[in-house]
Amino acid sequence: KIEIDGNLDESIWQSAAVATDFIMFEPDNGKAIPENKRTEVRVLYDNDAVYIAAMMYDDNPHKILREITQRDNFGTSDIFGVFINGFNDGQQDFQFFVNAADGQADCITTDTNGEDYSWDAVWKSKAVITAKGWIVEMRIPYAALRFSGENKQTWGLNFFREIRRDRQKFTWNFIDSKLGTFTQQTGVLEGIENIKPPTRLFLLPYSSFYVNADARQKTYGTLKGGLDLKYGINDAFTLDM
């Protein structure tokens, strides 16, 4: 079992192939990532989810920028992201980001509508600063993705890294800024077999507490709560309630 703690101490991670040799997207499009900022990403899967482990080397780890923010707000932080297209058709990416302060962001991206950050999936991640850089570990359940029912999967895949203090962005599969969009220039993930698209049902409970004070200095509180429901009707439509 993989524990999402950012330690990468499970032996199974060592058996996974390594994605490396990232290429700069901005500002010097096409330039190789410096050796002292090299990035290594591994992917594993089981019957329920896909797992991502990223080691982002940095020769000055004390300078890694991190800011605690709300969900879907990157703030002033280094970022790691994974882009997944379960149909490998260049049409729609599911993008998952973790910043160096351990914050999450996610969105659905299409060429037509751009990035939609109102979409929120349920997934796990952990970011840890180390003496060599920083680590991100992620567990993305299949319920957060779209993919075919084929026994052998071929997914579009890319990884993203931003080094905020240097204003530099890198991707694993080269994104030529003179050509199409991110969704049309992904790499390919093969080897995932015998998984089935699950029922896409998320239940998201929430609560809030309000404190009120009137002119007579009387203070009282109000507790509110509720439940958001997201249900995948089919590959194209999701019901939000």
Which residue ranges define each predicted feature?
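Structural preference for beta-rich elements and adjacent junctions enriched in aromatics
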Residues: 1-240
